[in-house]
Amino acid sequence: MTSNIILTGFSGTGKSHIGYIVSQMMRWDFMDTDDELTKRASATIEEIFKNYGESKFRQMEKALISEFSDLSNFVISTGGGAIVDEENYKYMKENGFIVCLEAKADTINARIKQQHNVRPLISQGDPHERINQLKSQRQHQYAMSDWTVHTDHLTPIQVAREIIRAWEIRQDQIYEQVRLG
């Protein structure tokens, strides 16, 4: 049986907030890989990018994601670009049910502006254009998720319920496959 729920998707789709809600509803632990990275590095993501570059950030992210195999009954929110790396995808697929949270570029842009967080890859140039560009580059990897939830017109609770419903469907499918041999 799948032992973790792993959230992926672009920045601003609600992964951290919704992941926490799902963990509370399921009485599971919650981990946000970006938060965990900033704790371990004693620096913000913006500082990591500025001082060490994106490649160092991705290296740290990969090391953290490889630790998934030791976790069980966790809801894990990953960074927006984590799934792009093949090894990260492999770890995610082997150790969890991957749910992609989707939203339109306009929705993402509005949410990011409300959060007042600096997103290093989006802050270069026109944010709306950059969001569209990065989403387009990552769409193939996001499409490899086990389930996708469009968050534009749903409340966080509705999204959380949809994730749990999807996870339960997947567990039933796995159980039937095992039972039928």
Which ranges hold each PLM region?
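Hydrophobic anchor at the beta1->P-loop junction of P-loop NTPases
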Residues: L7
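P-loop (Walker A) phosphate-binding loop of NTP-binding proteins
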Residues: F10
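ATP-binding Walker
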Residues: T13
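Walker A/P-loop
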Residues: S16
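NTP-dependent small-molecule kinase module
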Residues: I21, M25, F97, S136-G181
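Post-Walker A helix-loop "phosphate-sensing" segment adjacent to the P-loop in P-loop NTPases
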Residues: Q24-D32
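ATP-dependent small-molecule kinase phosphotransfer cores
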Residues: D32-G81, E86-K93, V118-P120, P127
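A glycine- and Lys/Arg-enriched "phosphate-lid" helix/loop adjacent to the NTP-binding pocket
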Residues: E94-Q139
